[in-house]
Amino acid sequence: MGGIGVISGKGTRGGGHVSLGGATSQPSKARFEMHASTSAPTPPGTVNPFVSTTEDRLSTFAIDVDTASYTLTRRHLLEGALPDREVVRVEELVNYFRYTYPEPTDGGPFAVHMDAAPSPFTPGRHLLRVGLQGRRLSITERKPAHLTFLVDVSGSMQSPDRLPLAKRALRMLVDNLRDGDTVALVTYAGDVRRVLGPTGMESKALIHAAIEDLTAAGSTAMSSGIELAYQEAMKTLDGTSVSRVIILSDGDANVGATSHEEILKRIRGRVKEGITVTTVGFGLGNYKDERMEQLANQGNGNHYYVDSLVAARRVFQEQLGGTLEVIAKDVKLQVEFDPAQVARYRLVGYENRNIADRDFRDDKVDAGELGSGHTVTALYELELKPGAGEGLATVRVRAKKPRGEKATESVHPFRATSLAESFQDARQDLRFATAVMGAAELLRRSPHADRWSLDTVRDIARASTPKGNAEREEFLALLEKARPLLRAVAAR
């Protein structure tokens, strides 16, 4: 079986099954700038190309733990329709699933893991998996959370899968908070309303009643709602607790100062003050997925899509610690491929998380946040040169403490000797992640997947799904939903 590197985010080098620490030399900044890529906004639907290592040996991106794309894709398939290409973000489908990465053992905020195997899709190519596992904080370790719920109660939120579901999700979240946490509630439609100021958990009944009284009507003044939510959040901002605005909406905004760039600018400014944003999307039809994702990205938070109570339970109960508690911020990954070993590479997904190579060590450049217990997985397609030897790739991770301003860097080499001899010899989690990646590439009609087969994806997923694993079994069922839809597209 191919090896998987296990390295704590606190250390600098590692391989095999150990957690190591120590210093290491770093290449000069000029070297990184020489291979710099663009950091301009990536248009929706863009697919990362293959890159020659002689032109750019460095791949740099911000982590992403959002999962909204999987839930939204699932909703489309269950309703008998293919999602739009731009809705399918490969990294969010892959990161939706749980993988058994060992946790850090030396007190660091995360551990880094790597493994690789031949590609089951394209002969002569390999797949490299890079994973991060965040440290899990206990309930007692979690900081007090001061949450401001910003709820869209406009007319577009009337259907059962929107405001009624959002209310049930909020009640579930409140029931999983603890002493020391507070909740404020702001709504927006044609105007904005402060429903409840910061309220402690000793008054849960009052919070539940305020949520239950919410009704939908009118137009959508999102911009004004965000401003009032921040005013409420400032009341409990103390520099030591979690301060987060949670926006629940279908993303529509049609009244008020709703310039999208203006809203994003306000959110970026509030992040510097210590208030982050999580977005939770509801509904289908006119749902503005891209808008909700951008709000969360600029707010240093997460983007979720909730289509059922099961999905709400996952976000607000099972993964509440990760939803609320950041253990590392501005987390960047940079993978350096050895041109003597690797001819070309392609990062699958993360198109809207790309960072210029020269900005990897610029601590002023924003990146992604890692929550308690969160995992991050990235997959690369590689074309190796004949007789690839030792130094296949080096993974560098930079991250700041939750309230820090200076990042630390860890370095993790991956050697060609750690490659699995065959895809069947690869670890079960790598095989399943490959199946999810393959399905996502097919669903977004990636040009790199022209010769890939949904049958191959299904066979891989089936062989890497343990009996009783409900999440993976659901994925298998979704593949069957996708089959006739993809065939219909191919026949046109």
Can you name each region flagged by the protein language model?
Residues 1-39, 45:
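Intrinsic-disorder/low-complexity signature in envelope-associated proteins
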Residues 2-8, 14, 38, 211, ...:
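Exposed boundary/loop context
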Residues 28-76, 81-87, 104-112, 120-128, ...:
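An acidic, Ser/Thr-enriched
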Residues 84-99:
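Extracytoplasmic
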Residues 111-331, 385-389, 402-404, 476-488, ...:
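Exposed acidic/Ser/Thr-rich ligand/metal-binding surfaces
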